[in-house]
Amino acid sequence: MMRRVTSSLPSALKLGRSLGPNVRFSGGAAAVEASPAIPPNSSSGKTLVRNMKPRELMQELDNYIIGQTEAKKAVAVALRNRWRRHQVDAAIREEISPKNILMIGPTGVGKTEIARRLAKLVDAPFIKVEATKFTEVGFHGRDVESIIEDLYKASLTQTKQNIMRRHEETARQKAENRILKALAGVSDGFREHLRSGALDDIEVIVELQEKKEKPKNSGTNEGVFISLEIPSSIGGQRPQTVKKVMKIKDAIPAVLQEELDKIVDTEDVSAEALRACEEDGIVVIDEIDKIVTASGGYKGHQASAEGVQQDLLPLVEGTTVSTKGNVQIKTDKILFICSGAFHSVKPSDMLAELQGRLPIRVELKPLTKEDFHRIITEPRYNLIKQHVMMMKTEGVDLVFTDDALWEIASIAAHINSTVQNIGARRLITITEKVVEEVSFDGPDRKGETFVIDAAYVRNSVESMMKKVDIKKFIL
């Protein structure tokens, strides 16, 4: 239903304009208080790693990841070297290849988190894959060349977003003009009211291109779909359009997106995406130790594991991969970051050729009691702050004393050292147990202050600690 407002549209009437036939009112009235018609560019506040110095990138990662200075430094330098390579002469640029990285460390110390945070910062095509998802060519499953195809898809998406970001202001102007033309037949006078949101609840008839859903393959990525539909642009035909009655606040995003799509269609997206993929692409391969077999060990259960390593060799060294769309992608300038816990195998158990293609080796250290305390206090949106803010939604003021935080860190370190070391993930288990009662009773404790101290922490995890102690005596 349309929102009725007692005031009419004074600004438009004072201008002496007559609204066109494509406009509908709710009782001749319009909204006078609303959010801006077109949202500001949401990407404008994003700091891109391409323009960041290694120290600045380190500081950004420090907001989320505690310790592991060597790993963060290696990644920061590797990314800065991508920028440096673009600044040198073209003759030497072709000779400079990225120095691939191998991150080694127990589970839960920050390997995956470093990759995840990089994905949010980096202004380059980026994908993260699990090594266990791939099989040797000839076995059932995905082969490693699909990594490069996925990277190219990520590059296409990012390139389109970058083009849209560059031309967003132009598209915004065109979208406003289309709405104003449908609204009043003119684009003078009403633009400020449109931007202020004063016209948001007016219904207007807009003409949008009709979008047809493409048939999807069922279940698998195999096979090729051949479309027999003839594009409407052939033979000079205009794309099919459909008229829709929409509120202005709903029409503007749709029209803006259509204008952006038109701009993207005129740009050479494929060529720019291919260049970005080949020159700036970053691939993170996690759990690489899971495709490594101990020297002299039984290999029957991992028949294709060594084959996956063999298939990775040409990708990491540099080859040309042909995608399903017949796009030729060179991989010699793509940066590969591999990581693994290496609990049951050693890095030296990897194929010697693959070891040689990962020249920068970084060891992440196990977490100590002090590290655990820093993890739940220093990061911008640490685990404790998350629980506090969640309980605030129930009207409960949740307070952790300093000795409670140290107790949580101490228990996490103790359980990791006596049972199995799962790193920082242990903190999630403990804190969830600690806040279990207040989370359950939260709706009934509105307006209360709930204080958690060291004694409360010990009582909450007492049953967990007893199970840990018993396990030490069970063979």
Curated annotation (Swiss-Prot):
Localization, UniProt: Mitochondrion matrix, Kinetoplast
Domain of life: Eukaryota
Listed GO CC annotations: cytoplasm; HslUV protease complex; kinetoplast; mitochondrial nucleoid
GO terms (BP aspect): mitochondrial DNA replication; proteolysis involved in protein catabolic process; rolling circle DNA replication
Database matches in CDD domains: RecA-like_HslU (cd19498)
The organelle targeting sequence, given as a residue range: 1-27
GO MF, one annotated term: ATP hydrolysis activity
InterPro entries found in the cross-reference section: AAA+_ATPase, ATP-dep_Clp_protease_ClpX, ATPase_AAA_core, Clp_ATPase_C, HslU, P-loop_NTPase
Record Gene3D superfamilies: 1.10.8.60, P-loop containing nucleotide triphosphate hydrolases
Keywords from the named record: ATP-binding, Chaperone, Kinetoplast, Mitochondrion, Nucleotide-binding, Transit peptide
Binding site residues for ATP: 66, 108-113, 286, 353, 425
Chief localisation class: mitochondrion
Purpose: ATPase subunit of a proteasome-like degradation complex; this subunit has chaperone activity. The binding of ATP and its subsequent hydrolysis by HslU are essential for unfolding of protein substrates subsequently hydrolyzed by HslV. HslU recognizes the N-terminal part of its protein substrates and unfolds these before they are guided to HslV for hydrolysis. The HslVU protease complex functions in mitochondrial DNA replication by regulating DNA helicase PIF2 protein levels.
Subunit structure: A double ring-shaped homohexamer of HslV is capped on each side by a ring-shaped HslU homohexamer. The assembly of the HslU/HslV complex (HslVU) is dependent on binding of ATP.
Family, per entry: Belongs to the ClpX chaperone family. HslU subfamily.
PANTHER family found in the cross-reference section: ATP-DEPENDENT CLP PROTEASE ATP-BINDING SUBUNIT CLPX-LIKE, MITOCHONDRIAL-RELATED, ATP-DEPENDENT PROTEASE ATPASE SUBUNIT HSLU
Name recorded for this polypeptide: ATP-dependent protease ATPase subunit HslU1
Organism of origin: Trypanosoma brucei brucei (strain 927/4 GUTat10.1)
Phylogenetic placement of the source organism: Eukaryota, Discoba, Euglenozoa, Kinetoplastea, Metakinetoplastina
